[in-house]
């Protein structure tokens, strides 16, 4: 009997609760578990397309995004992967086309653009390269055409 109770307890400790958009109230950028907006939600959050395919998934801590935030195309392929810390952008933001190819890469630090930003064509050619430091333009910015010819350098 004790082994069954121990196994059940271990299973329940590992279980994670998930809510969907209709289960939460969004107010001023924070998700709550009730209409009185007194209890910020902590846990996994998901949204689905009308056909049941996963649209997005993220973890909320005290009602705000925390960690990895993934957005999907209706086909089920990943469209974007973002990183949050205490409800603000922090880390990489990757964007993919419907074929799964990386077409955008951006960096944030504590909610501000910080680091390299790159955009590629669907053919994989680099189109733009930009740099930011603490939200402000920095370094040399470049752009190329679809064939890889340099168009501008500032």
For every predicted segment, state its role.
Residues 17-154:
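Glycine/tyrosine- and acidic-biased, solvent-exposed loop/turn segments at the edges of beta-strands
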Residues 1-25:
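Bacterial Sec-dependent N-terminal signal peptides
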């Amino acid at each position: 009997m004790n082994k069954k109770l121990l196994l059940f307890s271990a299973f329940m400790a590992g279980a994670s609760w998930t809510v969907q958009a209709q289960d939460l109230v969004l107010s001023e950028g924070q998700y709550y578990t009730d209409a009185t907006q007194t209890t910020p939600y902590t846990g996994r959050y998901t949204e689905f397309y009308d056909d049941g395919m996963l649209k997005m998934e993220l973890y909320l801590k005290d009602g705000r995004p925390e960690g990895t935030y993934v957005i999907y195309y209706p086909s089920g392929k990943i469209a974007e992967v973002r990183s949050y810390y205490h409800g603000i952008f922090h880390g990489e933001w990757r964007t993919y086309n419907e074929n799964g190819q990386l077409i955008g890469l951006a960096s944030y630090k504590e909610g501000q653009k910080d680091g390299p930003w790159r955009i590629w064509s669907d053919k994989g050619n680099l189109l733009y390269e930009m740099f930011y430091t603490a939200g402000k333009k920095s370094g040399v910015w470049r752009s190329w055409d679809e064939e890889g010819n340099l168009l501008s350098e500032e």
